Amino acid sequence: MSDSIFPINPDAALAIHVALSAGIVAAIIVVAALLREKRAGARPDVPYEGGVLPAAPQQGPINAPYFLIAALFVIFDMEVAILFAWAVAARDTGWFGLIEAAVFIGVLLLALVYLWADGALDWHKERKR
């Protein structure tokens, strides 16, 4: 009898995972193409998520709340990768690993509270300095 919980060949499991992942990606692309807004004269080569029109004349300093929120998202999103790696090895790390993870999460929460108090998460307000 096998020690594995799942009675499936690891190569078959990998093939199923890759096929499902590719299918989900293809489905998302097809649904996005069907649901997107189709405008006459739209330029498909122009990025639309940056918050700044690339052809617009410069009229002073750029208000960059979008870029700040995006940078904060990337910074705080990295914690997920780090905590996922910890969760995979949680049984092996024992109490010391749990304390390390708690300190890491505590530091992240302190950073979040600081950013919240500083106004960095407010989209339309000027930041307090």
Swiss-Prot record:
Keywords: Cell inner membrane, Cell membrane, Membrane, NAD, Quinone, Translocase, Transmembrane, Transmembrane helix, Transport, Ubiquinone. Signal peptide: none annotated. It catalyses: a quinone + NADH + 5 H(+)(in) = a quinol + NAD(+) + 4 H(+)(out). Its EC number is 7.1.1.-. Disulfide bonds: none annotated. Its main location: membrane. One of its GO terms (cellular component) is NADH dehydrogenase complex. It is found in: Cell inner membrane. Pfam families: Oxidored_q4 (PF00507). One of its GO terms (molecular function) is NADH:ubiquinone reductase (non-electrogenic) activity. It comes from the Bacteria. It is an enzyme of class 7 (translocase). HAMAP family: NDH1_NuoA (MF_01394). Belongs to the complex I subunit 3 family. NDH-1 is composed of 14 different subunits. Subunits NuoA, H, J, K, L, M, N constitute the membrane sector of the complex. NDH-1 shuttles electrons from NADH, via FMN and iron-sulfur (Fe-S) centers, to quinones in the respiratory chain. The immediate electron acceptor for the enzyme in this species is believed to be ubiquinone. Couples the redox reaction to proton translocation (for every two electrons transferred, four hydrogen ions are translocated across the cytoplasmic membrane), and thus conserves the redox energy in a proton gradient. This is NADH-quinone oxidoreductase subunit A. It comes from Rhodopseudomonas palustris (strain HaA2).
